[in-house]
């Protein structure tokens, strides 16, 4: 039985605010060897971890990341009121450099760094790429650049970046010429956008599927050729696979 690798999707998002240092640290403590985060640029082009286009859901604030400087963003906190109330009310927005420092302390961990389309739209491909690579300079060997935006991945390849992953809007987009031209190391797809049946394995690329919190679903996907599973419940999923790993051993 093939057991897929597990990716801490947005950190340990089941129990902590997503894309924050405390959630990523918790995921690593739980045993995560892979983490996934989203990156946007502040007004002064400092890369920070943030998923949404607006601040309201995560911070209960108005506006967008790229409208504020890094210094101004220090006034906001990522606490996800709808899920956690005020439990994490003082939890700051995490910079990409802070994630890099964490990765340096955990060389066994690989991070999938999603370059968000909103920042590429505002600042352009090269500005996003340059600032992200600068922030991650000490730990680039541990990082895979991923995006829905194929041109930014093509630019990374042109600069010699070692590992990229294309996020697909639909599974059949993996056949698109621009996707094939970058020879992605990883192909990401939402579980709901996969074909219901058939082999999902792709030569030359590892398939990563999100969002899965059911161990049996993960095992079925692995049987179809999926290499990695993204999950908000990293600790629970790792624990669920322990008996399977022991039986396999």
What are these regions (language model features)?
Residues 1-249:
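Phosphate-group recognition and catalysis centered on beta-loop-alpha active-site segments
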């Amino acid at each position: 039985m093939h057991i897929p690798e597990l990716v801490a999707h947005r950190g340990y998002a089941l129990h902590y605010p997503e894309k924050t240092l405390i959630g990523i640290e918790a995921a690593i403590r739980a045993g995560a060897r892979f983490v996934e985060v989203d990156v946007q640029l502040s007004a002064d082009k400092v890369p920070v971890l943030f998923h949404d286009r607006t601040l309201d859901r995560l911070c209960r604030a108005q506006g967008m990341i790229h409208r504020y400087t890094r210094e101004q963003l220090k006034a906001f906190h990522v606490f996800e009121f709808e899920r956690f109330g005020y439990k994490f009310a003082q939890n700051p927005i995490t910079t990409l450099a802070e994630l890099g420092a964490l990765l340096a302390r955990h060389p066994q961990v690989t991070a999938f760094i999603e370059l968000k389309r909103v920042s590429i739209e505002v600042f352009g491909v090269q500005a996003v790429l340059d600032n992200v690579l600068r922030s991650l300079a000490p730990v680039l060997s541990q990082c895979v650049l991923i995006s829905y935006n194929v041109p930014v991945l093509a630019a990374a390849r042109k600069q010699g970046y070692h590992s990229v992953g294309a996020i697909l809007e639909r599974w059949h987009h993996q056949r698109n010429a621009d996707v094939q031209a970058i020879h992605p190391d990883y192909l990401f797809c939402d579980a709901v956008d996969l074909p219901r049946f058939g082999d999902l394995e792709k030569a030359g690329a590892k398939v990563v599927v999100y969002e899965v919190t059911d161990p049996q679903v993960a095992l079925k996907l692995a049987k179809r050729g999926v290499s990695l599973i993204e999950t908000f419940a990293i600790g629970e999923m790792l624990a669920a696979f322990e008996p399977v790993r022991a039986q396999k051993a």
